[in-house]
Amino acid sequence: MDEMVLLTQEWLNETYKGKSGYNSIEENGKTGWKTMYALTRALQLELGITQTSDSFGPTTLRKLKELGPISTSTNSKKNIVKIIQGALYCKGYGPGGLTGTFGQGTKEAIAEMQLHMGLSKTDGVVTPKVFKALLNMDSYILLNGASEKVRSIQQWLNNKYYNRENFYFMPCDGLYSRDTQKSLVYAIQYEEGLSDSIANGNFGPTTQRLIPVLRIGETDEKNSFIHLFQAALIFNGYNVPFDGVYSESVRSKVKAFQSFAKLQQSGTADFQTWASLLVSTGDPNRKGVACDSITQITSDRAESLKRAGYKIVGRYLTNAPGSTLNKKIQPGELETILKSGLNVFPIYQTYGGATNYFNKEQGKKDAFAAYKAAKEYGFKNNTVIYFAVDYDAYGNDLNNNIIPHFEGINEIMNGFLGSTYKIGIYAPRNVCTIVSKKGLAFASFVSGMSTGFSGNLGYPLPYNWAFDQISTITVGNGSGMIEIDNDICSGLDNGVNTINIVPSENKKFFDQIDVLYETAEKYAQMQSDLNNGVKKTQLANELVAQYLRKDDYKGWKWVPTAGQIDPIYREWAVKR
């Protein structure tokens, strides 16, 4: 517990409790989002905003601009200064008390935070953007286990671009995150010459069109594109200098990344390389050799996929209970897929689209269900089954739901069932990485199309990625037309090209039917020869049915509906 954080919480509740737009908070001396939200709402009330919000939005920013910079030389409301001082304590800085007076202690605390944010101008003045940076949980000091190099880039970006209208201070904690990635895209847009009204932090068509190609020997002179490209490499885990020089060492790391992401290994910073560094789809127009689909693969569709260059197809083991969507592998479909020369990999998903689905017990159930279905379809041992996390899981969801779920899957699949099948995960990048690093998944199938997911934005490709789902397309035409998800394949898992022939539970019965029909067909041929044109096939079918009902469905009562039983054929069949 921090005494000054507690004092801040007590002051907030004492001052604003009962006022419309303020929500009282627990007084526990612990910094957290609820305290930051309370400080934000208190500021909004002091600025005359009646429709308060937890969000530090455009109205709050506009009102602060109207108020002007806050410093030792300005006369601000006492309560606004207390909000600044309380926020400083929550951030770990000491302003010298919750006094309501913007004195030297407050100025020095703000200046220290500005230094940590990377600003060359550490004047201790609270501008609207500095105030916004105060009222969140971002850290401006290096966190345990984080990268000093990443932090230095975060600071560099803050200092270089904070004067642009929509560029807000990012954390300087040494962690590559959603905010850092978005700030990097803003910086690219500014270097491309986009105005403040157009730059939006999204890697959209205009940004893509203007992205430059960078080559060995080039340096940053008139712009900072090489710095930004180096930053993208560093954020993705490639240790290159951050010096604005496209050196041989940079080229070498670029080729390593291109190899990992299955791009052409040119060593050049081309569009596809930029895209793969910045967004989870990379270039969505890339053509993969793998795909997945909810639609049955017929022979015509298989031919369409092959003509389009696909070699591997993912299909679902089961349908979702209560759903009318029939997405599972159909009888005979695997034989059709494999006969066409395609490989196949299995996906298990019944629902998996929200947090409350995931827990350890459900993981155990899913393991049993996936195992049963895979065995019934004939998938051989060591086939990878991909279990789906089909939503933007982050924060507490991971520790409280997703990890226990995959622990349950492992307990059954690798314990009780004896490691028959390998466990894969279908999920956003970060979820795949966290689950895999805990040893709970062998391979990752990345839901890369969801570029805005928290688990994709600001996270590199998982080290064990097998498939990367980047676009939905339609291939073929007529009876061969099929909609698929287009997947890039790393080669870690190429699916399977053979399955076990699964014996039917009714094999003995079907064998008996085969013998009966063969006998009936011979008898029917004789009848056809004797009776000029009796339809042999129809008669053979009727004779088989007669034999099967001979013991229980006989006698004069059955004659009007089922007809007479041919006694000669019956004796013939019994002998055989």
Swiss-Prot record:
> Which InterPro entries does the annotation name?
Glycoside_hydrolase_SF (IPR017853), Peptidoglycan-bd-like (IPR002477), PGBD-like_sf (IPR036365), PGBDSf (IPR036366), Rv2525c-like_Glyco_Hydro-like (IPR015020)
Gene3D superfamilies recorded: Glycosidases (3.20.20.80), PGBD-like superfamily/PGBD (1.10.101.10)
Induction statement: Repressed by FadR in the absence of LCFAs (fatty acids of 14-20 carbon atoms). When LCFAs are present in the medium, they are converted to long-chain acyl-CoAs, which antagonize FadR as to its binding to fadR boxes on target DNA and thus derepress transcription.
Q: Output the superkingdom of the source species.
A: Bacteria
Task: Give the family this protein belongs to, as stated in its UniProt record.
Answer: Belongs to the FadG family.
Protein name, entry field:
Uncharacterized protein FadG
Q: Which organism is it from?
A: Bacillus subtilis (strain 168)
Q: What is the lineage of its organism?
A: Bacteria, Bacillati, Bacillota, Bacilli, Bacillales
Gene that this polypeptide is encoded by:
fadG
